[in-house]
Amino acid sequence: MELAFEQKQRSCLKRTAHLSLAQEQTQELIIPDAMPDAARTLICYAEPELQSKTSRAGSLLVTGNLRASCLYADEAGGLQLLTTDVPFTLKLESSDLQELTQSVVRCSVRSADSRLINSRKVLLRISVLVQADGYEPWTEEVRALTDAPACLQQKTQSYSNAVPVETAERAFQVSEELNVPEGRAKIVRLADCMLQPVVTEQNLVGSKAVMKGTANLQLTYLDEQNELRTLSLAVPFSQYCQLQGDYEQNEDVETTLLVTGVQLEPVDTETGQKLLFGAGILAQCTVIQPQTLTLCEDAYSTRGDFQPQWQEQEYSMRLDAQTLREPIRPSFPAQASAVLDCRVYPDAMALERTADGVIVHVPLRADTVYTDADGAVQSESFRTEVSCKTALDEDCACEAVFQLQPEGYAAAGSGAVELRYDAVFQLQSFAKQKLQNLVGGTLDLTRQPRAERASVVIRRTGAQQPLWDLAKRYRTTAQAIQTANHLTQPEVEAGRLLLIPM
């Protein structure tokens, strides 16, 4: 007879692309006639803003703008500032990308350089890094045996996995009227405004992804004495993102934030100075759902002739997700009396396999502006790295997301500049497994066992083995062997004398 099966559908999002692309943008700046000649450049700032991301057949097009500025010293040692916007377009290519591919994008600056072409012209070189994951809806039909005859023995196994089931986006604005703290030097001209939005709390409430976070502002500016100053401010925000599905408490949400624009205007008041702040942020939410996959990995019949049909398929299983925090405390030789400003740019990470795991390396570049013992403004760039280690089996894969914490800074020491930052690594480990499932078959019960077939077998086990294997070999059941021998475990130890009912 033909065995009956039911179709069970399992739906999720399948990641079809995991891409990364770095690209250098260049721009020449002409120093206006009203400004003095440049003697040397000190530091270049660049902050990325996303404008659009468009999925196409075979590619993902990401466009944006870099808010860039260059601080230079004139021949008298005074500080001068040039500002500009540098547009960028990156095309990430993959044959697996389609027009309907849903994307989650990260954008960062790898490095920002400035150099003099001549005393009236400056060249900016900015390297921008875009990382993207592409997802598409995927439905799998899993066959399960129904109304199985009592003589048909099944060995089923359940696998738990956390899979993405939905992505959604919400663009929102954060605005606030901020007070410059009392005692701070007045802001005359902004050199840079680095905005780092961070999610501090997120969860799912029905069909909404609710998030709370902080928009962290790091300002660099020139004061009334034309000296370089920094100021850190924070603006809390609370938002939600509408989802298509309605979720319970066992799902999680992962949110990736991108800055789409920043406006900051200093305003003088009778009591001091205020900052009119506004920013655009894009929240990219991914819902992660725990799912259980149950498969019949082996089967046999105690009677008749059983002809099974098997199907093998590869699955990607998420084994672990963890967050690690690592300090960044390197020091570099520099005759600095005070550090005026510091920018740290992370590069693309690299994974190093070890005997018992993997090390995630992130190269870092630190651009510093400081005053020397004579009070002159100097600048230096240093390179270092931060890493973290986690246990990982040889046949598993690891993915990481890196982020610098916003409260970092650099300090001058004895003949050195020390970085004092913290890094956060979000690690996930995966394993690809080829799993077998019973998808069809026939069972002919008219074929009877041989007449000389024994009713009981007595044997001693040579090695520890599962009762399932013994039962399958002698076409009996594991339960019958357990009952006859008063066993409680699914395996039997080596050297055990067994009574095997047939």
Placement of each model-derived feature along the sequence:
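Membrane-lipid interaction segments
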Residues: 2-445, 450-453
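Primarily a LysM-type cell-wall glycan-binding module
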Residues: 444-483, 488-502
